[in-house]
Amino acid sequence: MKDLNLYLIRHGQTEWNIKDQMQGSQNSPLTQDGILGAKVTGQHLKNVPFMQAYSSPQQRAMETRDYIIHENDNVIPTFELADLREMDFGTWEGQHVPMLKKEVPEFNTYLTDPANFDASVNQGENYLEVLSRMKNALTTIVQNAPEQNGNILVVSHGTVLRLLLCVLNGGDWRLHRDEDYFPRMLNTSVSVVNYQQSDDQTEGQFSVKFFNNVDHLNQK
């Protein structure tokens, strides 16, 4: 019986987060609040015996992961997984969100109507492509777990985690951008997904235990 808990964390706040710029495959540095949030998250999770720690290969995610595990007493192997990267926003990357909302009609489709979003407009990814690779990422992680039971840290990004967690929680991916339907992921929020696979199963089951928890940040 395989029984794994995946701790899914959004990276810490970055400079482009506070400037309301699209990041995607590009990167901007963690702010001081972002670094503090990662450290506080690490303190919150310091007694969790993580077997492994994954992140996307993007700097903001790797740094957040490293700040978190630095607070842990255990020696934790780290890995980068490309499928955990943020959604590729193509030509929108680096652009200010208010400008895109005002001047680019398809951007508002991206925000409010995922099923009809045409990614050819910005030469980036669409939501189903993102969902497919995020599912692949989780499959890779659970298949490569060094033990049958335990905890694994996974640091990724807001857009992709929101989509993934909505679907794993039984939600409709077409509605996941609706704040009343499923919330956006906050910086250094903690979500836990359990994976169970019995010995006679070829494929296990993911279930969301909780998502987007930031209670630990309110105590910093």
What are these regions (language model features)?
Residues N5-I9, Y54, G150-S156:
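Beta-strand elements within well-structured catalytic alpha/beta cores of enzymes
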Residues V40-N108:
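Phosphate-coordination/substrate-recognition cap region in phosphate-metabolizing enzymes
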Residues G12, G158, V214:
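Active-site metal-binding loops of divalent metal-dependent hydrolases
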Residues N108-E129:
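Short glycine/proline- and acidic residue-enriched helix-loop micro-motifs
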Residues K2-D3, M87-M99, Q143, E147-G150, ...:
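Acidic, low-complexity terminal tails and accessory targeting/binding regions
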Residues Y7, Q13-I68, N122-K135:
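Loop-to-helix element that buttresses phosphate recognition and phosphoryl-transfer chemistry
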Residues N136, A145-P146, I152-T159:
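His/acidic metal-ligating clusters that form di-metal
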Residues G158-R162, S189:
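GST superfamily/GST-like fold recognition
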